[in-house]
């Protein structure tokens, strides 16, 4: 029996939880496949993808720092990937390489489905204006919040990002500002798409951002609160979540694209959480 091959590619890659996630998805759905982690040289992404494809690979997940290169490698892209200008999922077929970006869909599904927080008519704040923010912006707009504010330490980047996406959702109030300019404003959902948690820091935000029953969401994850979530707790955010659910849900979106079946994520997410917490 031929086993379909998949992989996640990045640099670094040894920390990736994707092989374990997809192995469980395959077991759960009865799919015959293998999934491995591939380390690509920083200057050798294209060659590594082509080698895997020529060897019979069916698809790949792409992580840092190669999502922009993956976008350039595709023959066709999903609209959400085109809008993001970045790809985290490749599917190889007879008509070439198809690219998708499942990050935003994973974020929305985690918030709306797992956390039971509808985004429609909510005041949403997205922190950051880099690749992580850009990758989730179109699905966030499609969720039809009342307003979506992009805040960044460099306000010019936030304004440029808002201008690039404003036409995608003319009925959503989309604005941009600096962190300092957030003073006096209140939000129902605050999403951290900055890399501050990687440096064990939190974005420097003015106090009083969180409405009653607000959600603070960090796209990073770890054991216990990230620095952003700890700061949000102190500032009154009553619901807090890290990005582990987003990781699992974006993987499920990739699996659905490749295999045509959506796996159940609840058990996988619970198992990963136990591992993170040392259980």
From Swiss-Prot:
Catalysis performed (reactions): shikimate + NADP(+) = 3-dehydroshikimate + NADPH + H(+)
Keyword Amino-acid biosynthesis among record annotations: yes
Annotated family: Belongs to the shikimate dehydrogenase family.
Physiological role: Involved in the biosynthesis of the chorismate, which leads to the biosynthesis of aromatic amino acids. Catalyzes the reversible NADPH linked reduction of 3-dehydroshikimate (DHSA) to yield shikimate (SA).
Species name: Aromatoleum aromaticum (strain DSM 19018 / LMG 30748 / EbN1)
Gene Ontology terms: biological process: amino acid biosynthetic process; aromatic amino acid family biosynthetic process; chorismate biosynthetic process; shikimate metabolic process
Binding site residues for NADP(+): 128-132, 219, 243
Residues holding shikimate: 16-18, 63, 88, 103, 221
Gene Ontology CC: one annotated term: cytosol
rRNA-binding listed as a keyword: no
Catalytic residues (positions): 67 (proton acceptor)
One Gene Ontology MF term: shikimate 3-dehydrogenase (NADP+) activity
Encoding gene (name): aroE
Assembly behavior: Homodimer.
Pathway this chain belongs to: Metabolic intermediate biosynthesis; chorismate biosynthesis; chorismate from D-erythrose 4-phosphate and phosphoenolpyruvate: step 4/7
Top-level taxon of origin: Bacteria
Keywords assigned by UniProt, alphabetized: Amino-acid biosynthesis, Aromatic amino acid biosynthesis, NADP, Oxidoreductase
Protein name: Shikimate dehydrogenase (NADP(+))
Signal peptide: none
Entry EC number(s): 1.1.1.25
